Each structure stands twice: as C-alpha cells, then as structure tokens.
Amino acid sequence: MQIFSTRIRFLLINLFLTLTVCCYPQDFEVAPVLVSFDANPGENQTQVLTVRNHSNERQKFVLNLADYTLTMEGTKSVMEAGSTQRSLADWITVNPSFVELNPNESASINLIMTVPRTGFNTRWGMIQVEVAKEQMASEADKQLSTGVIIVPRIVVLVKQSPRSNQNYRGTVTGLREVEGPDPEFRSFEAILTNTGDKILEAKVFLALANLETAEEKQFNPVSVSVYPEQQRKVVLTLPEHPGPGQYALAFLMDYGHRMAIEGAQILLTVE
C-alpha cells in the first residue's frame, strides 16, 4: 500500500463541494490518502486511517463514504455512496465515523473491509473527512437549519481488488495526430481501454522509428491510471523535431505484471 499524507494549514476550496460554505481557517492532517485492500472473497481486512488536529482549538471530524466515477480525461466525479456498480460502500465499515479532537490530538480510524464470497471483482470509493463547525442558530446560514457548517474536506481514495484476481488487460486504439498544448511540436492522441478487472497503473510513451535508417527512439513516459471498464483519452507530445523522412510512430502502454506492452502505430511523414 502506498502511503501519502495531506496537510491543510488554511481553508481550501475543495472541488468536491457542491455547496458554498463559510470560511474558517483549518489545520488538520489525514494519512494515508490512498488505501488499497487485497482481500480475497470471504476475507476481512482492516487498515488504519489517522486523523490529526493541528489547530489550536477543539475540532469535530466526520467521515462520510462516497462513490466516484471517472471521465475519459481522468476527472473524478463524486457520487452518492452505493450508487455505482463498482461501489464498495456495502463492504467497508468506518469505525468510528465521527471524532472530536483536542489541539494536537490524533485519532485512529479502523477501515474494515468485509468481502462477500461472491466478491471477485475490483471496487473503489472514497472517504471524505470533513471538519464540522457549530454555530448558534441565529448565526447560522438560513439554509443550514441544523446550525452545523461543513467546511472543505480531505478525500481518501479506497480500492479493493482480490489477490486472486490477476485479470490485467488493456488495449491502445484510435491513434491520431491532434493539436497539442505546444503548437511548436506535434501531438498524438490515443484511447486506452481497460478490458480486464484490475486497475492499470500504466506508463505510456511515444516511440519513433526512422524507416530508412532503422534508428529508434523512445521518449519519457507518463503515468496514467485506467480503471476497469474505463477508457482514457491521453495526448502525448513528440518532444523534438525529427529530420525529413518516413517514420513509424508508436503510442505504447506498459502496465507491468509480465504482460506484453500494448500499442498502436501510424506512419509519419516529415518534410
């Protein structure tokens, strides 16, 4: 499991919020922000999430489950927990889901993954760690009848994929030249499709072969995640100006696990 930590010293405007919130400075930490389970069907696994209050006042933290989907560009969209086919909301328990911490105090949150005997496929979701501020009813926004204001959050991504599931498979199609971010260099777009049932952590890169001299070059890779049943649209830029001639340009995807490198190829003429 890769562990990352995120620390907020001031109020952040979180893109996942759908409501305008009041602005209070916050200072808290959540670690890790990426949690990966590999429980086989019928197994239970537990991992620990740490929430630490770095502010100088007592704060309340709420942990809420949510689903997310991804666009072809890789943008995540937050969905209601349990609303998607790949949701793990029914498999995961967050205990406790509410904590109140003094300054510099931390809490350990148990994330318990209970995989049913039929749970062979990969699933994912998120935990939104939010800070709640209480106000007197007379001071609260009229639309917030509870008198509790939710301020921006830290998002923890959670993934579950059985160890027994080794279905890594993907394709590269639709290679074409497009207008890229830098008009001085030529850019190329391809569609990466995950046709398996594991999240592909892939390296994608361009390779150029001169058809006259047989000279080949590979260029620096870019990291891309492709979820099961997802397509990702990726644009790569050729970082140099090749000399005149005929070339074979390949758009390649290497997702490891002893699988063959996938790719698509087009002919390129440079005058």
Q: What kind of feature is each model-predicted range?
A:
Residues F10-T20:
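Bacterial N-terminal signal peptides
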Residues P25-Q59, P96-F98, R169-E189:
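Beta-sheet-dominated interaction scaffolds and their linkers
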Residues D27-A31, E57-L111, K203-L206, N210-E216:
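Surface-exposed binding patches on compact interaction domains or structured appendages
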Residues V35-F37, N95-L101, N220-V226, T237-P239, ...:
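Beta-strand-rich interaction surfaces with strong enrichment in secreted/lumenal proteins
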Residues T46-V48, T93-V129:
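Ligand-binding face of N-terminal immunoglobulin V-set domains in extracellular IgSF glycoproteins
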Residues H54-E57, R117, N194-L200, E212, ...:
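Short, acidic/polar linear motifs in exposed loop/turn regions
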Residues F61-T69, T114-Q160, P242-E271:
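Terminal connector regions
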Residues V99-S106, S223-Q231, R258, V270:
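Short proline/glycine- and polar residue-rich coil/turn motifs
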